[in-house]
Amino acid sequence: MTDTNEKIRSLFLTALMVFSVFAGTIAFSGGAAAAANVSVQQAAEYDSGTVELALNGSTGSTVNTGDIDIYVDGNKNPSNYGVSSVDTTDDGTTGRLQFSLDQDVQPNRNLTVKVSGLTGGDNTVVAEDIDVTSQTIDADDDSGDTNAFRGEVLAIRADGDTDNDDATSSTKIVVEDSNGAVVTQDTYTANSKVYTYETENLDTGEEYEVSVAGDADENITISNLDLNVNIDDDVGDGANIDDKDTLAVNVSTTRGGEPANATLFNEDDDKVATQVESLKGNENVVFDFGNQSADDSPYYVKVTDNQTGVSAESDQINVSESDDGEASFESSTVQDNIGDVVNITVQVDNTEDAVINIGDENDDNYYIQGQLEDDNGDGEVTVQFNSYTAGNYSDSTVLSVPGDDDIDNIKEGGDYTRGSLSGDTLEAGSYSMNVTAGTSPDVTSPDTVGTLRLNENSVENIQTWAAPSDADIDDDDVDIYDRIGENLTQSDDVAAEDVVVHEIQASGIEGALEYEQEDGSASDVTEAFIAATDTTPYRINDSDATTSGLRLYVNRTDVGANADANPIDFSNSSDAVTVVDDPDNNTYFVAVDTSDVVFENGKTIVKEEDTRLNATFSVREGPLTDDRNSDSAIYTTSERDATLDLDDSGVVTVSAAAGQEVTGETNVAPGSELEVEMESESDANPFVIRPEVDVATDGTYTATADFQDYSAGTNFTVQTLDVDGDSDFSDEEDGRIVEADTATVSISEQESDGSEVVVDSAQLSEGGFIAIHAGNASGDVVGNSEYLGAGSHEDITVTLDEPMDEDFTAVAMPHQDTNGNEAYDFPGDDDPYTQNGSAVTDSANVTIVEEEQTEAPDTETETEAPDTETEEETDAPATDEPATDESETTAAEGPGFTAAIALIALVAAALLAVRRDN
């Protein structure tokens, strides 16, 4: 018994020793914290320049303004951020230090505070990177709603000013969404009356309720500032650039007028450069950081809105070391015609700049030079050389660059000069070209050489086209070729009041038109063409050359004997003329509205008469050529007319059914929209039907109308109305409604070997055929019957064009024999019988069956011995055994819990030992 007691005593003493070790550890930890210097638990700037430091203990002595140093973005005590006062209550001795600055700190600034002269320790406390808030909410103010942008840092103050709700470390702050769901729940830091709240994780467009100490005091509505930082090729050179390119970003936001701070960071997150610009609402603002070294790549740009502190970052921008720049021609030989604008494409690599030279002062007695800049960064610059103005006008009229690229420092020289545009242009022939990367005008060793070949110009052809009177052709009509076959048809007979389009195929015109449009007073291609081309009536027969040498006259030739020519006066017909140019194909379309043209004698085209016209385009002897080049086209304008198609009895016949067609033909331009008016002469069946029709390319038109609601035997009149829908220009014809052709058909489900189907019955009022469609009424026609006479038919066998090898749906459809040849000619002729506007049909499933083949019985029978081994798979009934969860021992954390476990284990061991001894 004594041994037992001694064992218990020893175990108990051991337990006390173990417990004392843990207890000592706990006591030592607390003692170490208590012995530390005073430190900052939380720091915040709020309420227009007020700073709070929540400390973990008293400063030991009152903090004065002279004890505080302010660092803004690393600058110590800037003059406009001085400490104006220290709160008399919260002076540090209470564990809270509050003081005011001369100026509010913007949320994008870095704020650090150093407090010196404290009692004990190292006498100093430092708060770095203090939370600078953009707005302050008073928990006891009940001021209502606060609007904030997502990403702002807000200060929620509970300082007991009115409701005695001074915050403590147990004061709860709760933020709930509009549905009452808690999104944030926290407590104030000890010795702090300010809770800093980040709105980054809140949803835009939502309203949130803020409660402090159980009271709902404030609502916050979250909006989106939409601060975007984009890498844009239009403002810089993109996301993958070299050290010669420009690193720039576009910044936009929904709210403008406020400054923003853009900082460029390198791969080590070190600041490289900073810019401040005022943002514009929904407009891009460019932050340009110029050229950057490849050594610190990649870079990114962080932009912070100064007022709210909301930030956004760009994607990564990679900068590589640039290679030596090089320039070349896309094609080493470029050719065009004298008077045209030559497009020369220069390609640049590892550079934005290049210098181009065209011609040689010694060999050609002419040269022009320009400095190119690839502003859009696509590696190409298209140079336009106007051979019409070369050697005469200012340099900029000769060399130009379209689009976003640029050309500067143009210099033209050589012995070749022109006093005016009436002087001779450059001679046809080959001219040297070269291009060199860089900006130096002194080129001794060009990167690439090439040849510009200028050929003689010519007038190849002029032909006429007809377009509807309302064709609305304009000078930006880039799709004029798409009109061909729709509302533009080649013709030398044009209906009066329609538009006649003169297609001129000629080279050497482009330069004169571009000069008038770019450097003259012309606002569009039409004005440029009229300005560059002599169309003056009284000078048409003048043998003297005009300034440009270009001439167009349209002369009336049917004026009779002993009469002067009567040309169109384009100067008084400007509203009637539209020009569409296609210089790439040396083609120019001059559209003239025949309803508006005025002749030299002041008269217009009489629409009731035929007028014969001769259009001639020429390049006269002058600056562009030494010889006259021309071509002419003769055409006639005729009275507008339309003729309706009649049956053998001289009337327009339609059936009392839907989808009835009335046809005719006209001389107005294809594509014109006409109307066919059909008006009843019966009081019992009154109607007026006006379907619209489009004139086809062959001059025909087809009007479709529904007569199924009107009785057979009704008479009506029919006439064609012009484009305006009022004036009729066809004779009024008689029309009659007759009985509609009718048909019925029936087919049943059946089995077939796939070669034929059987239609149960059909009734055809005018005879015809039964066609079989596969699948549905619009499916392929797979077979048709022989001709069936008018009347009823039963058990009609239709042989299929190709045998069917699988089941299908057969759709039986009666067709007419519209051309009377008793042969099935659909499509084209032999339309289906219809009812209510739809084809008459019936359908049934056809099952494909194969003929049974009888095979001779196999006389040899193989008998397999029974398998003596039987494998049985016995599915035993599933028994649900309880799964054994292997318990996982989780180490408890905390010194108190560990000590208790150890003590319990020792006591249990002691009791077990006693039991064994007993």
Swiss-Prot record:
Glycans are attached at residues 37, 56, 110, 219, 250, 261, 291, 306, 318, 343, 392, 434, 487, 541, 555, 572, 585, 614, 715, 776, 836, 845. Residues 815-894 are annotated as: Disordered. The keyword Secreted applies. GO terms for biological process: cell wall organization. Residues 1-34 form the signal peptide. One of its GO terms (cellular component) is S-layer. Residues 849-875 have a biased composition (Acidic residues). The chain crosses the membrane at residues 894-914. Keywords: Cell membrane, Cell wall, Cell wall biogenesis/degradation, Glycoprotein, Lipoprotein, Membrane, S-layer, Secreted, Signal, Transmembrane, Transmembrane helix. NCBIfam families: halo_sig_pep, halo_surf_dom, PGF_CTERM. S-layer protein. The S-layer is a paracrystalline mono-layered assembly of proteins which coat the surface of the cell. In H.hispanica, the S-layer contains two different glycoproteins, Slg1 and Slg2, which share highly similar amino acid sequences. This is Cell surface glycoprotein 1. It comes from Haloarcula hispanica (strain ATCC 33960 / DSM 4426 / JCM 8911 / NBRC 102182 / NCIMB 2187 / VKM B-1755).
